[in-house]
Amino acid sequence: MEYNHQEIEAKWQKFWADNQTFRTGTDKTKPKFYALDMFPYPSGAGLHVGHPEGYTATDILSRYKRAQGFNVLHPMGWDAFGLPAEQYAMDTGNDPAEFTAENIANFKRQINSLGFSYDWEREVNTTDPNFYKWTQWIFTKLYEKGLAYEAEVAVNWVEELGTAIANEEVLPDGTSERGGYPVVRKPMRQWMLKITAYAERLLEDLEEVDWPESIKEMQRNWIGKSVGADVTFKVEGTDKSFEVFTTRPDTLFGATYAVLAPEHDLVDAITTPEQVQAVADYRRQASLKSDLARTDLAKEKTGAFTGAYAINPINGRKMPIWVADYVLASYGHGAVMAVPAHDERDWEFAKVYGLEILPVVEGGNVEEAVYTEDGPHINSEFLNGLDKAQAIEKAIEFLEEKKIGKKKITYRLRDWLFSRQRYWGEPIPIIHWEDGTSTALPENELPLVLPVTSDIKPSGTGESPLANLTDWLEVTREDGVKGRRETNTMPQWAGSSWYYLRYIDPHNTEALADPELLKEWLPVDIYVGGAEHAVLHLLYARFWHKVLYDLGVVPTKEPFQKLFNQGMILGTSYRDHRGALVATDKVEKRDGGFYHMETGEELEQAPAKMSKSLKNVVNPDDVVEHYGADTLRVYEMFMGPLDASIPWSEEGLEGARKFLDRVVRMIDNSEISDKNNGELDKVYNETVKNVSERLDLMYFNTAISQLMIFVNATNKAKILPLEYANGFVQLLAPFAPHIAEELWVKLGNEAGISYVAWPTFDESKLVESEVEIVVQINGKLKAKIKIAKDLGRDELEKIGREAVAEALEGKNVVKVIAVPNKLVNIVVK
């Protein structure tokens, strides 16, 4: 048959759509399997070849599980709120909803062209009021539980974007992740979510999920649990004092100065007149920096002396109090006791300002370099000679006994800044009344629909563009009290924190989802997506899930039982002698090398992340047109382990297509028979066993290798049993579903391979029935023969003698050594 991929793929995509092949199964007697992709933001650029890698993995598992008799839930949707659509609307005057709908249509077309087995009846879109009604409902529950609150917060304000951004969206150089704009600190009224109330559970329950250890560790570090002590320091000559949290109370004897965050409440009260100007200037500079820029370990340490002194509570020594931006008001108490001998930042600061460095742990020369290793304590009175653990325990006992400190657990995790000064987001369902109260909208008034406007522009007040829409903004209560709707909208994280629940029951108008269906489908069995979401998205989704668990809405503590992060597909890039990247449209290939078209310089080829600026993005539409969706799927799964980052290769793509061509030829050209001569028994049963085991482990590349081994074996076989041809096509189907469907019908089967029971293997056939043995005379090889396995020594000797009968003529056989399944050695004279 001719392998016309375009015709074959269109034909079977239509068949699946017409027959609703991938509707989620509802047979209560079957086990369930929920395979979830991290849903995409539908950008104007459409899919690139990196997207299908994770989608292909979950699709393979979904097809495999259907054939194994599972009810499979495999949905797709759109994380469609977001700044790019709003920026586009502001730049062009077009409706972000229309722009988003066009992008979704394009994404959906591309996804369908790749043959993914999604149940489109369950499609969700975070911008659909029927979806965000429940996002708003969850917010009202957070509000009722005191987990959503308003606060004056110094936020990361980006003037060019007209909004505040989260700490995680600020780059180390102090610019915004989106657009690279300057970020300044600015106090604003913001909505916060109290994720810190769940810190311990978010930490503990990581033990219950099957996630990569590296991702768990990133979450643990982000939560940042610290066990230590709160210590009270008095300010000399005043009735003032301040608290410091330290994980190393054992080093108090080495605390030689104190540092307050520039925003600390005490700064104004304790700064001496001589230092007021210097401190004010310093605080102004600090306010322009992001938290990330302030705490960057590589940055030069700066500060200002307040003129005041603290008293070290453990030994009564005076300690100068400084203000420095490497201390954050939001962490601990916004104050640190500096132990420069044993802390990198404190040591650097002390060196810059000539402050005392007193070692209290033995080892190293602290005048030359900070010493951060463990060792016995010195210069520490009653702690001398103790190791770290003993000294910490004894120091805390002393502090508590003297009532100058107490044991404390803290977390690095901060409450979640939840509001954005944007139009294109979920409206926050809160009304602020003129009498100073605020109320959440009741459920029967949800969704609070985002008002349509053709003129999205900044409010000029720091509020979102919704502040301009007075008809929507201003409300009056039945008792005549006037109110104003909340103008902040939710961040893009909101919808993605619970969307996996809505897939379970997407058309329910009475509840977020039917409790019985949630019980049936949760938790998600496999969640596949990029490691860039390791901390934020996964932490936020886990937080919301735990709140919903406490409310009795969901039956599980954790949302995602197993997590897998696919690697990145890298593009080709070119670098000049300075290491600068050169866009691919400025490169020409000649004489086996790569050259800059403008300068003529020879360039070095290297893999790099695909990006529009480098013009090295590969569009899956082009690949599907020229090679076919099945080729793309097989190539992306065969290019290496799923979690590895691997460069895109046109040669690899061609190799995948050649493999599928060979599969077609195998079915076309083999003598397919109802009979079985046993030639392929071992390799076929090995193939069923190995492919099944490797699918369970998500070792897709080695599963494909095993399929290739089978195809190679058929080339040497006289016949291909029909049972084995059918079984092979079934094994191929999760990887290359279109061509598998076509070959399935060609083999005489009824159309539709998706629910045909997965092949099984015969354990007894995994063992060879024949073995090759060597026949030697006086230890020299004379023959190799195939014989039945496990023959006895007498039979072996007889067969061996017959095999070399001519060579034995006229010889005297002294003895025969027969080793079953290995050799016959005939000793002659």
Curated annotation (Swiss-Prot):
<dbReference type="InterPro" id="IPR009008">
    <property type="entry name" value="Val/Leu/Ile-tRNA-synth_edit"/>
</dbReference>
<keyword id="KW-0963">Cytoplasm</keyword>
<feature type="binding site">
    <location>
        <position position="612"/>
    </location>
    <ligand>
        <name>ATP</name>
    </ligand>
</feature>
<keyword id="KW-0067">ATP-binding</keyword>
<feature type="short sequence motif" description="'KMSKS' region">
    <location>
        <begin position="609"/>
        <end position="613"/>
    </location>
</feature>
<dbReference type="InterPro" id="IPR013155">
    <property type="entry name" value="M/V/L/I-tRNA-synth_anticd-bd"/>
</dbReference>
<dbReference type="GO" id="GO:0005524">
    <property type="term" value="F:ATP binding"/>
</dbReference>
<dbReference type="GO" id="GO:0002161">
    <property type="term" value="F:aminoacyl-tRNA deacylase activity"/>
</dbReference>
<feature type="short sequence motif" description="'HIGH' region">
    <location>
        <begin position="40"/>
        <end position="51"/>
    </location>
</feature>
<keyword id="KW-0030">Aminoacyl-tRNA synthetase</keyword>
<dbReference type="InterPro" id="IPR009080">
    <property type="entry name" value="tRNAsynth_Ia_anticodon-bd"/>
</dbReference>
<dbReference type="InterPro" id="IPR002300">
    <property type="entry name" value="aa-tRNA-synth_Ia"/>
</dbReference>
<dbReference type="InterPro" id="IPR002302">
    <property type="entry name" value="Leu-tRNA-ligase"/>
</dbReference>
<dbReference type="Pfam" id="PF09334">
    <property type="entry name" value="tRNA-synt_1g"/>
</dbReference>
<dbReference type="InterPro" id="IPR001412">
    <property type="entry name" value="aa-tRNA-synth_I_CS"/>
</dbReference>
<dbReference type="InterPro" id="IPR015413">
    <property type="entry name" value="Methionyl/Leucyl_tRNA_Synth"/>
</dbReference>
<dbReference type="GO" id="GO:0006429">
    <property type="term" value="P:leucyl-tRNA aminoacylation"/>
</dbReference>
<dbReference type="Pfam" id="PF08264">
    <property type="entry name" value="Anticodon_1"/>
</dbReference>
<comment type="similarity">
    <text>Belongs to the class-I aminoacyl-tRNA synthetase family.</text>
</comment>
<dbReference type="Pfam" id="PF13603">
    <property type="entry name" value="tRNA-synt_1_2"/>
</dbReference>
<dbReference type="GO" id="GO:0004823">
    <property type="term" value="F:leucine-tRNA ligase activity"/>
</dbReference>
<dbReference type="GO" id="GO:0005829">
    <property type="term" value="C:cytosol"/>
</dbReference>
<dbReference type="Pfam" id="PF00133">
    <property type="entry name" value="tRNA-synt_1"/>
</dbReference>
<keyword id="KW-0436">Ligase</keyword>
<keyword id="KW-0547">Nucleotide-binding</keyword>
<dbReference type="InterPro" id="IPR014729">
    <property type="entry name" value="Rossmann-like_a/b/a_fold"/>
</dbReference>
<protein>
    <recommendedName>
        <fullName>Leucine--tRNA ligase</fullName>
        <ecNumber>6.1.1.4</ecNumber>
    </recommendedName>
</protein>
<keyword id="KW-0648">Protein biosynthesis</keyword>
<dbReference type="InterPro" id="IPR025709">
    <property type="entry name" value="Leu_tRNA-synth_edit"/>
</dbReference>
